[in-house]
């Protein structure tokens, strides 16, 4: 009886693994899209702008658990399928810019800091969104949302 339950549990877990993998394969290539972006601002406000998109030959991130539900980090990078507006990838992260915004200098100066994040390379057009946590309500609010076509001539293929 224990063997039957163990085999059934193993079969169920294998099926979940196959479905998670197929979701990756449905939306992404096995390579990376590096998103170089600037975070600019001061203590009171901030904004973001994409500086460069670069195709990289290998995806070293997860192929399962593509949506980060942890809520950790001061920022999130989200990827939405353009056709359905479905969230297909997300990751939380922190930056030195976020720490700098808490300094005395940020009360009187505005600065811009360059950052990079890698996402799986999409097969079809997507929206890339960068959100920031608002310390007042602890919710994430969008800093930018930009359409990215994987066939674009503006993606550095070098």
Model-identified regions with their sequence ranges:
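Bacterial Sec-dependent N-terminal signal peptides
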Residues: 1-24
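Structured loops at beta-to-helix junctions and adjacent beta-edge loops in soluble globular domains
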Residues: 38, 80, 131-133
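Short amphipathic, basic-aromatic surface patches that mediate peripheral association
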Residues: 23, 28-68
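Extended low-complexity, serine/threonine- and proline-enriched intrinsically disordered segments
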Residues: 69-92
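Solvent-exposed serine/threonine-rich low-complexity stretches and specific carbohydrate-binding patches
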Residues: 88-108, 144-147
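Extended acidic/polar, glycine-enriched regions
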Residues: 107-158
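Residues embedded in well-ordered secondary-structure elements
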Residues: 9, 24, 66-68, 106-108, ...
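Short, surface-exposed loop/turn motifs at beta-strand boundaries within globular domains
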Residues: 28, 59, 68-73, 110-112, ...
């Amino acid at each position: 009886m224990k063997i039957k339950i163990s085999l059934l549990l193993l079969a169920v877990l294998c099926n979940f693994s196959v479905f998670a993998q197929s979701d990756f394969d449905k939306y992404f290539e096995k390579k990376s899209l590096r998103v170089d972006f600037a975070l600019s601002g001061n203590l009171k406000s901030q904004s973001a702008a994409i500086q460069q998109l670069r195709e990289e030959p290998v995806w070293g991130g997860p192929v399962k658990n593509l949506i980060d539900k942890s809520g950790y980090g001061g920022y999130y990078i989200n990827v939405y399928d353009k056709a359905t507006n479905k969230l297909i990838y997300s990751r939380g992260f922190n930056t030195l810019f976020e720490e700098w915004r808490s300094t005395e200098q940020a009360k009187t100066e505005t600065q811009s800091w360059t950052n990079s994040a890698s996402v799986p390379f999409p097969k079809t057009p997507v929206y890339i969104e960068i959100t920031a946590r608002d310390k007042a309500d602890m919710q994430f609010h969008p800093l930018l949302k930009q359409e990215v076509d994987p066939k674009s001539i503006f993606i550095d293929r070098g």
